[in-house]
């Protein structure tokens, strides 16, 4: 065995960088306080240096793996050796910021990306309206359903489960394992997230193969090619999933923003280019279905490449691996080595996947099956009950109508899920419960304002605006009964937006704190709601001949049921934690706002404010400003408190949690004595 170089004891925090080669010891442990008398003794204790002698290797396999813990003292800052490589912590740069402020900043960044995304989609739709038909939009909607199904079944459950696996309170990387990383350290937790990300990759291969075999979804030429291209795009997208989940764990929203911003623009250019090439072939329908497939493939290639590059750049100095790697459990006994260093001897076997997280992901996956049937159930019903024309009408209304929902509400939902997952652990403190209640009440109350605007002005204003956007080709979107036209469906969709927004906010709380048993109960409830949704949708679309409008009303019924279930769950959650519950009066607007809003809604129902010209639009804008003024006057104090809450500079939650943990530790020590 080669002689190991000696090390002068610099300080208690210095890391040895010269013991063995990089191949021999992936991560060098901290240097000891006192120089040992025997170099071979260091090699035996390390467990990370590869022995050249076969007899020694045989002997080493009988030794348990070991983790070194250097003595730690508070308020000691060690100077860095100028020859020592600089180590950057994989802990996200936002750890020192308050959790609420970080979540709000991330949500703001995602809102910016959604604005860019929807502006690009808006421009693309406007260009496609010049060359595409409602039937082409209907065919592309079915391709989008295939893509969303593969991605949802492959990654949604894993993503939601991994949001519980945060870096808060994890041990620093002074714990070193010769064969990899250690459980409950920063690097060990990051490695667990990366390992779980590869489950999505494997699931994506399976579901993509199943979807590719089901290419006879609609009787259009090139349908088989289009479906197979979409499935390839899904697998390419999922190839970067380990990098995505790591970026979200580290709260690196900029990586996601960069990936989506570039990919969205490329997708729009590719989709429109292929649509132009196919416009002269059978009205553009047969060749046009390939445009969406090629556009999505370009999106997946760009987004995956950007994710991989940015996440690797952010984690250049790391102790974990981007490939699946074993994690050493931290279930052990303390021993004292000959050189007075604390050594943890591990008898448990290393693992790749965290079992509680896997079980949670399994429970969530069952629940997401029902959730997907409800979320995408409208596409299933519209493809079963309605022709391609009505499918196209619903698709274009969904693209335009969901602009506000996806620009504003979806990023808020993502931010709330991240916030609640980090704030409310297994044993949340009283301060954490109070803060979560304040944030939830504020969001729900704001959404009631949105509901007033949507119900008061949406049905009267949006049909005219949408008809204007359709332009000269608007006639082909108004065939048949007026109630089945695209503008009429858009007016109904305005009523659906606040239900969708409120449900997203409440379910983000449920998904952040629910146990596997809670998720199973939710899955059963969603199964019942899906039956109700399908029954009501079929009745309204087919029996009452409402077309796509019937589907919108069925969605409102569905969202109402889901909101009711979430409200009951949240009530019992706070009761079970013996915390002050949500006061219903805190969720309702003031009397002045309610009076103004009800007056506006009644006027809309009786035809007052019906828009047929831009002059009428101006009148409605004036009424909307009056409602906004009433909100500002009535809710000025609540709005100021919300702004102060978001801009809070000190994370009192972390301080209180630390104090409670110290009290529990003192209590347990007293009981042991």
From Swiss-Prot:
One of its GO terms (biological process) is glycolipid translocation. Residues 1-96, 651-673 are annotated as: Disordered. It is a multi-pass membrane protein. Keywords: Endoplasmic reticulum, Membrane, Sugar transport, Transmembrane, Transmembrane helix, Transport. It is found in: Endoplasmic reticulum membrane. Intramembrane glycolipid transporter that operates in the biosynthetic pathway of dolichol-linked oligosaccharides, the glycan precursors employed in protein asparagine (N)-glycosylation. The sequential addition of sugars to dolichol pyrophosphate produces dolichol-linked oligosaccharides containing fourteen sugars, including two GlcNAcs, nine mannoses and three glucoses. Once assembled, the oligosaccharide is transferred from the lipid to nascent proteins by oligosaccharyltransferases. This is Man(5)GlcNAc(2)-PP-dolichol translocation protein RFT1. It comes from Yarrowia lipolytica (strain CLIB 122 / E 150) (Yeast).
């Amino acid at each position: 065995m080669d002689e190991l170089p000696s090390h002068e004891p610099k300080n208690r925090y210095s890391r040895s960088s010269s013991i063995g080669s990089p191949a021999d010891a992936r991560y060098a442990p901290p240097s000891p306080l006192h120089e040992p008398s025997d170099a071979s003794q260091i090699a035996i204790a390390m467990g990370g240096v590869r022995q050249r002698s076969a007899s020694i290797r045989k002997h080493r396999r009988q030794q348990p793996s070991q983790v070194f813990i250097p003595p730690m003292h508070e308020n000691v800052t060690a100077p860095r050796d100028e020859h020592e490589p600089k180590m950057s912590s994989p802990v996200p740069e936002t750890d020192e910021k308050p959790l609420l402020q970080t979540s709000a900043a991330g949500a703001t960044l995602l809102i910016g990306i959604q604005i860019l995304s929807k502006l690009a989609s808006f421009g693309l739709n406007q260009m496609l309206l010049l060359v595409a038909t409602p039937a082409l939009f209907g065919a592309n909607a079915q391709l989008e359903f295939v893509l969303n199904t593969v991605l949802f079944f492959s990654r949604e459950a894993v993503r939601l489960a991994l949001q519980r696996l945060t870096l808060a309170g994890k041990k620093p990387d002074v714990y070193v394992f010769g064969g990899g990383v250690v459980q409950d350290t920063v690097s060990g937790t990051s490695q667990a997230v990366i390992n779980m990300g590869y489950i999505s990759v494997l699931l994506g291969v399976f579901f993509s193969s199943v979807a590719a075999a089901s290419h006879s979804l609609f009787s259009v030429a090139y349908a088989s090619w289009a479906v197979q291209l979409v499935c390839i795009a899904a697998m390419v997208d999922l190839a970067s999933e380990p990098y995505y989940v790591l970026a979200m764990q580290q709260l690196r929203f900029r990586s996601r923003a960069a990936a989506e911003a570039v990919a969205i623009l490329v997708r729009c250019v590719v989709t429109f280019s292929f649509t132009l090439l196919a416009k002269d072939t059978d009205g553009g329908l047969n060749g046009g279905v390939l445009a969406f497939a090629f556009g999505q493939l370009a999106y997946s290639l760009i987004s995956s490449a950007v994710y991989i590059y940015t996440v690797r750049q952010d984690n250049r100095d790391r102790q974990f691996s981007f490939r699946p790697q074993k994690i050493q459990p931290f279930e052990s006994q303390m021993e004292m080595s000959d050189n007075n260093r604390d050594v943890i001897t591990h008898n448990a076997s290393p693992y790749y996947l965290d079992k509680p997280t896997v079980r949670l992901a399994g429970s969530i996956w069952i629940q997401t099956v029902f959730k997907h049937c409800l979320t995408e159930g409208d596409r299933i019903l519209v493809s079963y009950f309605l022709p391609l024309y009505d499918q196209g009408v619903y698709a274009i209304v969904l693209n335009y109508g969901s602009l506000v929902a996806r620009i504003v509400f979806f990023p808020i939902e993502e931010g709330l899920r991240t916030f609640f997952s980090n704030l409310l652990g297994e044993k949340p403190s009283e301060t954490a419960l109070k803060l979560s209640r304040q944030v939830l009440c504020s969001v729900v109350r704001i959404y009631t304002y949105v509901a007033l605007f949507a119900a008061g002005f949406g049905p009267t204003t949006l049909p005219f605006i949408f008809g204007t956007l359709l332009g000269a080709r608007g006639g082909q979107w108004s065939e048949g009964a007026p109630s089945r036209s695209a503008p009429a469906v858009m007016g109904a969709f305005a009523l659906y937006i606040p239900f969708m927004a409120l449900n997203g906010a409440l379910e983000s709380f449920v998904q952040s704190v629910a146990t596997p048993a809670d998720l199973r109960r939710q899955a059963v409830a969603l199964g019942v709601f899906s039956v109700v949704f399908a029954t009501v949708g079929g009745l309204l679309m087919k029996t009452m001949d409402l077309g796509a409008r019937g589907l919108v009303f069925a969605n409102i019924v569905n969202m109402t049921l889901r909101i009711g279930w979430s409200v009951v769950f949240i009530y019992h959650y706070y009761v079970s934690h013996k915390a002050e519950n949500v006061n219903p009066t805190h969720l309702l607007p003031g009397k002045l706002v309610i009076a103004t809003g009800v007056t506006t809604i009644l006027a809309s129902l009786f035809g007052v404010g019906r828009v047929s010209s831009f002059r009428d639009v101006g009148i409605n804008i004036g009424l909307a400003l009056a409602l906004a003024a009433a909100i500002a006057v009535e809710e000025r104090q609540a709005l100021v408190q919300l702004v102060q809450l978001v801009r809070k500079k000190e994370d009192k939650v972390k301080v209180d949690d630390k104090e409670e943990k110290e009290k529990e530790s003192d209590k347990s020590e007293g009981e042991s004595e």
